Amino acid sequence: MSVLICTFTNAQETVYKTIENLTYATSQDAYAQERCKLDIYYPENLKDCPTVIWFHGGGLTSGNKSIPTKLKKSGMIVIAVNYRLLPKVTISECLGDAAAAIAWTFKEVEKYGGNKKKIFVSGHSAGGYLTAMIGLDKKWLKEYSIDADSLAGLIPFSGQVISHFSYRKMNGIDNLQPTIDEFAPLFHVRKDAPSLILITGDRELELFGRYEENAYMWRMMKLVGHEDTYLYEIGGHGHGPMGEPAFYILHQQIKRILNTPAKQ
């Protein structure tokens, strides 16, 4: 416990380092070589640190990795991930890249002072979708002999929980035609999942009924018996602006989860 207290209260005294463009998946494919990179931001003089893996947004069709300012100097390791994008690849390849980046983190994070039992996954919009999919559909991490339930928590910001609209578009399905198939986090609700913190913007300002999707996800997780699902609606903030206040919730929930005794 003393390390955790040090981590969050003495962060201003800590020296941080950033290493950019580490390869997390090897491939002969030029596009994979370009996109399967991550940046890691870590405190040099702390150990046993929590880690946040951050997936950028952009509708699965655009965007680039960056370390969110609100996650810096907080005593945590932050890993920002690029992944291959639609329509150059399939939705399965996007998800496979996300899983590979998480697997890399499990393998490597202790070298940077991290604790494999304190790995959280988060991201905004498309990044939130990837967060929920990899954390709930266990097959993606199983490929690396990792149990998705060993993640400390999933914290998607305004993530789609039905099948992603860009994936639907590639299959000739309209943006406003709801679809729930194997590529929808909702399809994979389960009792034994990691802690799930759902955060959206104002229901009247969000994209495509994003709040209502997440509210249904929250309800279904509760109904299947998941005991640690939370839902937050950030009033007065739309899809993009909700990210800034959402980081406060992320920090508070990480502290809560880390200070909650593990069930035997």
Outline where the language-model segments fall:
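N-terminal cap/lid segment of alpha/beta-hydrolase-fold proteins
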Residues: 12-46
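Short beta-strand element of the alpha/beta-hydrolase
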Residues: 48-57
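Active-site glycine-rich loops that stabilize anionic/oxyanionic intermediates
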Residues: 56-61, 160
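Short amphipathic alpha-helix adjacent to the substrate-entry channel of hydrolases
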Residues: 64-81
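Alpha/beta-hydrolase active-site loop
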Residues: 89-110
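Primarily recognizes the serine-hydrolase "nucleophile elbow" in alpha/beta-hydrolase
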Residues: 106-169, 180-181
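The feature captures the conserved acid-bearing segment of alpha/beta-hydrolase catalytic domains
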Residues: 145-153, 158-167, 176-215, 219, ...
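C-terminal catalytic histidine-bearing segment of alpha/beta-hydrolase fold enzymes
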Residues: 215, 222-264
